C-alpha cells in the first residue's frame, strides 16, 4: 500500500482524504514547517501534500520513496522543480484554486482603498466620531 503525508493541518480534511484513498493509500498528517520536519516525517512517503512547505532539492533528495508532490494551492514556487524533475517526481497543483475568492478580495480592497475606507475607519476608531 502507498503512503501519503499531508504536511499541514486543515479542519476535517484528513478524514475526507483517508476515506477517498482507503485501501489504496495510507494518509497521515504531520505539520511540517521546516526542511528537517519534512525529512523526519516523510522519510517513507510515496506522496506528500503541501501548501507552502519548503520542498527544496535537499528535501526532495532526502526522501527516497517520493513519487508525487501534490501542491494544494495555485502556486508551487516552494517546490524545487528541477530537483523533482531530475528524480522523475510528478508535481501537481490546483490551477484555479481560490481564484474567484482572491479576485473578489482584491476587487474589494481596491474599492476600499479608492474610497479611503481604511483611513476613515482608523479615524473613527481613534477619534470616536464620524465627521466627513
Q: Across the structure, where does each feature detected by a protein language model lie?
A:
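Rossmann-fold NAD(P) dinucleotide-binding segment
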Residues: 54-67, 80-83
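Short beta-strand elements of ligand-binding domains
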Residues: 50-51, 67-73, 93
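N-terminal glycine-/charge-rich "phosphate-binding" loop or analogous flexible N-terminal tail
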Residues: 1-45
Amino acid at each position: 500500500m502507498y503512503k501519503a503525508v499531508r504536511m499541514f493541518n486543515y479542519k476535517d480534511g484528513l478524514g475526507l482524504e483517508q476515506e477517498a484513498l482507503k485501501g489504496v493509500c495510507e494518509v497521515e498528517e504531520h505539520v511540517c514547517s521546516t526542511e528537517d520536519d519534512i525529512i523526519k516525517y516523510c522519510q517513507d512517503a510515496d506522496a506528500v501534500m503541501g501548501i507552502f512547505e519548503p520542498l527544496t532539492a535537499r528535501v526532495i533528495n532526502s526522501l527516497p520513496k517520493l513519487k508525487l508532490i501534490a501542491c494544494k494551492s495555485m502556486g508551487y514556487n516552494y517546490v524545487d522543480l528541477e530537483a523533482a524533475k531530475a528524480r522523475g517526481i510528478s508535481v501537481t497543483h490546483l490551477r484555479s484554486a481560490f481564484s474567484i475568492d482572491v479576485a473578489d478580495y482584491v476587487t474589494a480592497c481596491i474599492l476600499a482603498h479608492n474610497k479611503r475606507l481604511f483611513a476613515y475607519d482608523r479615524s473613527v476608531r481613534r477619534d470616536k466620531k464620524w465627521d466627513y
